[in-house]
């Protein structure tokens, strides 16, 4: 079954992490194929496949020896978009698994420009989403992680519209009120 297959894959990739990292994820071709395939499973699989694939990815990117996998995955705009879609799935369990990947993306202090830009563009929607996300979960670790992610999102520049001589223009303001011109996305 697909559940057994995912358990075997998960076990193979998480049991000997240094070996897997050195022999599998250090090969860029292998890593890119893995990302492409795990994304297919997360996007188009059954509920169980989506959840297990997302859970596997979340567990792999937090393993220190898989740093190259983590950096490659979390700096991709397409990967961020997929994770954001999964966070809006009707299944609370899948939302939580996707959050475990999303928090790594948001916590990254060296986000790629495309990832940073999409987070800025969706700042207000994300803050609204997190107002109700995970309210049923009283686990202290989850609550702390959610609070940290909300703080990180709140610290992103805010895009506001204002009129100038040329008409409407997007302007980015930092949480402290500093203003800078925003690039169109």
Task: Cite the ranges covered by each PLM segment.
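Hydrophobic residues within the alpha-helices of tandem HEAT/HEAT-like
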Residues: 8-17, 42, 53-67, 86-87, ...
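Eukaryote-specific intrinsically disordered, low-complexity regulatory regions enriched
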Residues: 1-4, 8
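Generic C-terminal helix-cap and adjacent flexible tail
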Residues: 155-167
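Active-site/pore-lining binding-face segments in mid-to-C-terminal subdomains
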Residues: 72-106
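Alpha-helical scaffold repeats of the Armadillo/HEAT/TPR superfamily
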Residues: 1, 18-45, 69-82, 111-138, ...
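Proline/serine/threonine/glycine-rich intrinsically disordered regulatory regions
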Residues: 98, 150, 161, 180-185
């Amino acid at each position: 079954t697909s559940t057994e297959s995912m358990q075997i894959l998960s076990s193979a990739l998480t049991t000997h992490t240094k070996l897997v990292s050195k022999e599998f994820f250090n090969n860029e071709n292998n890593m890119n194929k893995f990302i492409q395939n795990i994304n297919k499973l997360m996007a188009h699989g059954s509920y169980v496949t989506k959840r297990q694939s997302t859970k596997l990815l979340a567990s792999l990117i937090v393993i220190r020896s898989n740093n190259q996998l983590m950096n490659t995955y979390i700096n991709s705009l397409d990967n961020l978009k997929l994770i954001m879609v999964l966070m809006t799935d009707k299944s609370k369990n899948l939302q939580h698994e996707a959050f475990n990947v999303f928090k790594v993306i948001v916590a990254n202090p060296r986000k790629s420009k495309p990832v940073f830009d999409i987070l800025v563009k969706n700042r207000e929607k994300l803050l609204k989403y997190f107002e109700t996300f995970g309210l049923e979960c009283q686990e202290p670790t989850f609550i702390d992680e959610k609070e940290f992610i909300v703080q990180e999102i709140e610290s992103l520049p805010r895009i506001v519209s204002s009129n100038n001589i040329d008409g409407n223009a997007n302007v980015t303001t930092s949480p402290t009120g500093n203003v800078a011109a925003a690039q169109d996305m």
